[in-house]
Swiss-Prot record:
Transit peptide segment: 1-60
SUPFAM superfamilies according to UniProt: Nucleic acid-binding proteins, Translation proteins SH3-like domain
GO BP: any one term: mitochondrial translation
Sequence similarity: Belongs to the universal ribosomal protein uL2 family.
Species of origin: Rattus norvegicus (Rat)
An annotated Gene Ontology molecular function: structural constituent of ribosome
GO cellular component, one term: mitochondrial large ribosomal subunit
Subcellular location as annotated: Mitochondrion
InterPro entries: NA-bd_OB-fold, Rib_uL2_dom2, Ribosomal_uL2, Ribosomal_uL2_C, Ribosomal_uL2_RNA-bd_dom, Translation_prot_SH3-like_sf
Coiled coil: none
A Pfam family that the UniProt record links to this protein: Ribosomal_L2
Quaternary state and interactors: Component of the mitochondrial ribosome large subunit (39S) which comprises a 16S rRNA and about 50 distinct proteins.
Gene3D superfamilies in UniProt: 2.30.30.30, Nucleic acid-binding proteins
UniProt name for this protein: Large ribosomal subunit protein uL2m
Amino acid sequence: MALCALASALRSLSLASPAITARVPTLLPVGQSNVLLQLPSALALPAHRPVHMSADRSAKFVSWKSRIKYTVKPVKMRKSGGRDHTGRIRVHGIGGGHKQNYRMIDFLRFRPEKGTEPEPFEEKVVVVRYDPCRSADIALVAGGSRKRWIIATENMKAGDTILNSNHIGRMAVAAQEGDAHPLGALPVGTLINNVESEPGRGAQYIRAAGTCGVLLRKVNGTAIIQLPSKRQMQVLESCTATVGRVSNVNHNQRVIGKAGRNRWLGKRPNSGLWQRKGGWAGRKIRPLPPMKSYVKLPSAAAQS
């Protein structure tokens, strides 16, 4: 349709005039311009390069979180709207919402400053505030010549002093809420959060608002933890955890009040299609999943 309209428009022009000839658009390759539009060779249109809209990401792609140097200042971030890099919708429940700034959280609690010995150190809580990118509150702590954001615990407030340690002694420590210790240094039954799965990797478990885990027992250099889902996890004793419960305990009791507030939070409405409740609906008695282990124990064949 567009090609026919372009051909009729070009036929209506006087091609003898050099001024009009210079203004003729060049949209088609050389082979197609003379055949389809019956134009003289002087009006031959150059070939064009096709545009690839679904090109794959390069193998050298680095996330923007890795490109930017750590800072306590808010960083502007762009919303995805539930789309991936090709523009296709991957998550239908995401879209819109108020603009948000990202604050870099340091999930590795025991991180000594450069040029210092890896010894326990203290930090002071400067402020505890709301974070739009997560359900828990965050705390700005300062120690030495640096500041950083961490996940705040339930009773953490400005002016508190927290301890970060990597030492495992013969006796269990009397840790205070907000302190970070290896699991091997904590007494059995301690409530913990922000647990590492591997030493030095940073907290990956129990980071949501109001959640906490329990240190059940310690066996042969490993620690058994009960997650908020009641599932048990086995990690090395040298993995770091924070003592206490994550802040914003009443997060699950908030009242949204209206549909518009969910749109402010970037949540799109679900389909209104009625679905018959089948076997998936309702509560069931299910056995607990097996214990998840992050400990690479030697196999029986290797020991024999």
